[in-house]
Curated annotation (Swiss-Prot):
Keywords per UniProt: Acetylation, Cytoplasm, Cytoskeleton, Nucleus, Ribosome biogenesis
GO cellular component, one term: spindle pole
SUPFAM superfamilies: FYSH domain, Hypothetical protein AF0491, middle domain
Name under which the protein is recorded: Ribosome maturation protein SBDS
Main location: cytoplasm
Chain's role: Required for the assembly of mature ribosomes and ribosome biogenesis. Together with EFL1, triggers the GTP-dependent release of eif6 from 60S pre-ribosomes in the cytoplasm, thereby activating ribosomes for translation competence by allowing 80S ribosome assembly and facilitating eif6 recycling to the nucleus, where it is required for 60S rRNA processing and nuclear export. Required for normal levels of protein synthesis. May play a role in cellular stress resistance. May play a role in cellular response to DNA damage. May play a role in cell proliferation.
InterPro entries on file: Ribosome_mat_SBDS_CS (IPR018023), Ribosome_mat_SBDS_N_sf (IPR036786), Sdo1/SBDS (IPR002140), Sdo1/SBDS-like (IPR039100), SDO1/SBDS_C (IPR046928), SDO1/SBDS_central (IPR018978), Sdo1/SBDS_central_sf (IPR037188), SDO1/SBDS_N (IPR019783)
Gene (name only): sbds
Amino acid sequence: MSIFTPTNQIRLTNVAVVRMKKGGKRFEIACYKNKVMSWRSGAEKDLDEVLQTHSVFMNVSKGQVAKKEDLLKSFGTEDPTEICKQILSKGELQVSEKERSTQLEQMFRDIATIVADKCVNPETKRPYTVNLIERAMKDIHYSVKATKSTKQQALDVIKQLKETMQIERAHMRLRFILPAKDGKKLKEKLKPLIKHTESENFDQELEIVCLIDPGCFREIDELIRCETKGKGTLEVLSLKDVEEGDEKFE
């Protein structure tokens, strides 16, 4: 006896569903549990480790696959992999209230850990503990966004915490060595991007050791490469400039 199975139905088990409404229709993708947040945070980069199948569904639990014409109309493409990426990034993860609560608590902790790792008290150059950052986040009533990466949210938290406490991103320590003919002109262009100059030696070449905001690194690197046509050098001496010692602000 044969059992008829419709070709547009796929049965899946132990699945995490991510849903998106677009063009008046509901679309879903089937993912492995615990992998959706890893993808969104950037920890997991292999799509095949996240998706149980590259198919796009109208309803995962019923195994109903979306029609190609609906995909084209709503997403402007029939490429299931590209559509899966869109839904994975912007869709809503369907979880129980208990699972959602646990997930958000973990993200809250992860965000606080990133902030504590990247920041210091600007007056003392001492780092803050994760617990203190968590308390500060609660004081400003920070609400975790499940669809946004923890790294991006950490940057948002730093901006908000600056309004209520002494905090800033720890500076990077750099050394540039610039050809003499480019040195003076390039130094003027670099000035606005430098927080503090520790030393400056001008002999046959211009050598500067300085502190910068990590957010300026890419611009500085590009400026030196372009202006010196690859003859200048840029060396990262330390990723975080903090005071020596184990003391942390509680």
